[in-house]
Amino acid sequence: MLEKLKRAIAGREGPRRDGTNALRLVDGEGDGLPGVEIEDFAGRWVVQTREGGFPEWLRGVRNELKGPRAIYWKRLGEEKEAPVLVDGEEVTEPFEVIENGMRFWIDF
């Protein structure tokens, strides 16, 4: 699973070249990881799953990849629910992200 995650991330390095730091890293079945979507918001990952809780194979991935500052989890379809911190630094204030040159403020 970790290798599939690494491939998915590597395949999305192109958009980052223009300064984009908010993008989808994993798109479920399309990346060989059915039921899992991962969004990156300036180094803060939000893992979303359709069924069950946080995927156990993702525990410890923050240290393994030396990548995200924090990993959050939420169930897909629960838009009104705030994501739950799983690992890393907690977001306590809104923060800025850039997507295709546009700036947005995100508040978990």
PLM ranges: what are they?
Residues 1-44, 92-94:
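Non-catalytic accessory regions of SAM-dependent methyltransferases
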Residues 2-20, 49-78:
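Cysteine-centered catalytic environments shared across enzyme families
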Residues 31-32, 39, 55-108:
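Non-catalytic substrate-recognition/targeting regions of SAM-dependent transferases
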Residues 44-49, 105:
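Short, well-ordered strand-loop elements centered on a beta-strand within folded domains, enriched
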